[in-house]
């Protein structure tokens, strides 16, 4: 009898907990995905703050030349970063218990893996939490779909690319200057500027910004005035009102005359779907591009592709980019190797037409 009562009480406690977790009446919705999201994101954020401030130098190239990234080791907000795991670790999973000591774990960049893995799990759970809340409120799942774009981009940069390159030392450092360093090295090694997927991503991000600005300015310019001239037009809107707050016919007519008729949407729902889909698809394609370049399926190579009738090379913009790539490649990991392979494989160029005569 006692055991039966205890089981009923446990079931009642679990039911109360489940109801609270999945309740849409809470100020912040938690959900089942939130049970995993909260501890992982808190862990990632805590470790990142501590590492950014006080982490010791990391032997990123695996050649016993540590690189300092924290504030206490001479960096500032711009130059500081959490340095990726050592090249000596490669793509091995490197938790604290795999190291002989905390000092060794820090020296080999263990915090980077801890932060990245917890962060990726956390943002994936955030995405799942968006779907869960939409489902419980009876909404369509497009918020979850839209957020999948930055999740895919983060996964491509922090997980897929290091795996494809064979080492987490090739991952993006967690800092401002580290991000730019990653971009420069990525261009040098993969020629991302000549990758169609990257071009689509640029069109998605900049096009999305343009369309957002156009839509916002059109709506703001065609608001239905409900206030006097001396009051802010924003006071004419009441939260939850059923009436349109702007004149879509006027906005459609203006934009149709500004460009041409069919460039303007006459359906508000189709318009907002387009505003969401354009940048999302662009970022999806960028993530796909980074994921394929992780396995060295690089951008197009048009180097020395234009020649005259006598076979002499006519340099194009592609050759200028190639020269810049070689320069960036030489500067990258300057102590890890003396001469990059892609530089050594090029045709030998003479530095002088003839040697000067030296009179003894």
UniProtKB/Swiss-Prot annotation:
Amino-acid positions noted as binding a quinone in the UniProt annotation, renumbered to this chain: 215, 264-265
**What EC identifiers does the entry list?**
1.10.3.9
According to its record, how does it sit in the membrane?
Multi-pass membrane protein
Source organism per entry reads Ectocarpus siliculosus (Brown alga)
Query: Under which name does UniProt file this protein?
Result: Photosystem II protein D1
What more does the entry say? 2 of the reaction center chlorophylls (ChlD1 and ChlD2) are entirely coordinated by water.
Q: Where are the transmembrane segments?
A: 29-46, 118-133, 142-156, 197-218, 274-288
The site feature described as Stabilizes free radical intermediate is recorded at 190
């Amino acid at each position: 009898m006692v055991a039966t009562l205890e089981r009923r009480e446990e079931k009642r406690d679990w039911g109360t907990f489940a109801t609270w977790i999945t309740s849409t009446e809470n100020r912040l919705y938690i959900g089942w995905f939130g049970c995993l999201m909260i501890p992982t994101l808190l862990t990632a954020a805590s470790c990142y703050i501590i590492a950014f401030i006080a982490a010791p130098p990391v032997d990123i190239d695996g050649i016993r030349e540590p690189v300092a990234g924290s504030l206490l080791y001479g960096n500032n907000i711009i130059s500081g970063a959490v340095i990726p795991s050592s090249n000596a670790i490669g793509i091995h999973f490197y938790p604290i218990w795999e190291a002989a000591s905390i000092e060794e774990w820090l020296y080999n960049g263990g915090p980077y893996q801890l932060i990245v893995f917890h962060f990726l799990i956390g943002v994936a759970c955030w995405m799942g939490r968006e779907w869960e809340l939409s489902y419980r409120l009876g909404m369509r799942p497009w918020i979850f779909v839209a957020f999948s774009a930055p999740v895919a981009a983060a996964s491509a940069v922090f997980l897929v690319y290091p795996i494809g390159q064979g080492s987490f030392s090739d991952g993006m450092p967690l800092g401002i200057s580290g991000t730019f360093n990653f971009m420069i090295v990525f261009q040098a090694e993969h020629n991302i500027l000549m990758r169609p997927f990257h071009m689509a991503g640029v069109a998605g991000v900049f096009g999305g910004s343009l369309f957002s600005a156009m839509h916002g300015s059109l709506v703001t310019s065609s608001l239905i005035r409900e206030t006097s001239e001396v009051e802010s037009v924003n006071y004419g809107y009441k939260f939850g009102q059923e009436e349109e707050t702007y004149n879509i016919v006027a906005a459609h007519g203006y934009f149709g005359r500004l460009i041409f008729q069919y460039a303007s949407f006459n359906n508000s729902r189709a318009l907002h779907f387009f505003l969401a889909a354009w940048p999302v698809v662009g970022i999806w394609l960028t993530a796909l591009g980074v994921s394929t370049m992780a396995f060295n399926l690089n951008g197009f190579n048009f180097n020395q592709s234009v020649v005259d009738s006598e076979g002499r090379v006519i340099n194009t913009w592609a050759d200028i980019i190639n020269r810049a790539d070689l320069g960036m490649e030489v500067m990258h990991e300057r102590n890890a190797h003396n001469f990059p392979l892609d530089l050594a494989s090029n045709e030998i160029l003479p530095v002088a037409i003839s040697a000067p005569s030296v009179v003894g």
